[in-house]
């Protein structure tokens, strides 16, 4: 099948490429590197018919990053390096219909999302990540499913790590694609034990600065 665009699969097929990218960030002074696992849950991987490899991809992604972070921490213990397990938004949305003629339709349920996320996060935790980073959040309901999955995965794996969130806004008014302001988003996740909240993607650092 066609694997173009499936960058996560490189953790299994060409790990040296991912190692080289991590090394360049560490050489540049990065304190935290992200695993190459942004799309590595079965919802997104189903597009490539490799959804059954999700656990392996995440495990490899975490171990590759962990090994390099540890190498650089050993070189300079005064500057410890950390690994964040990258968890993307998937290619589906819980809050909006993909069908303009049927606004009630949803391509995925909360439970389906949570299940896919939990599988991914358990493998990332097993591989040794220091934190879970739920990023490029465009739908608060997707994010809630991911947060729920993270707490479940940590409990199951017996490992509690910081939970980091990063939102993407889709207009200069600072709203997410699902229509929430940043304040509204914060209110919707304030129940969770979140370590940090940031912004990514969107339309660049300069335009994001006011938020």
Model-based region annotation:
Residues 1-211:
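Domain-level signal for soluble alpha/beta catalytic cores
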